Amino acid sequence: MVVWIVAAGALLVGLPRAIAQARVIEVTADSDSRYKIAGLRTPEIRVKAGEQILLRVTARRAKSWNRDGSIHGFTLLRAKDRTKVEGWDLLFKPGKQEFLRTVPSEAGEYVVVCTVICSEEHEGMHMKFTVLP
């Protein structure tokens, strides 16, 4: 099913219902090799198990990037064993992009890490991702 949405004065035509109903989370992958979440001092994402979310990402170039032009990564790992969550290994190009994802069904602590060596500060590019029941 297709729905019509008016956002910020612009008519968005033909968006699938899943996108229209998804919770939007604004993420910045910044030039200082840090994740930032709109409205939060400490970056953390808190979501419900199985929830549909739309990651609205602004990616800013740091000091280095991949050959394919990716400047930051966003990989979701289970905190307990650091294994990847399927479908959550994203690469960001410069600028704005959106990713529709379903939150894992297993409640618990996860961590988001950058998988692109974006600068000397790359190891510090991570944030908490909590899945609530």
Question: Model segments located where?
Answer:
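Bacterial N-terminal signal peptides
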Residues: 2-13
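Extracytoplasmic copper-binding redox domains, predominantly the cupredoxin/blue-copper superfamily
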Residues: 15-133
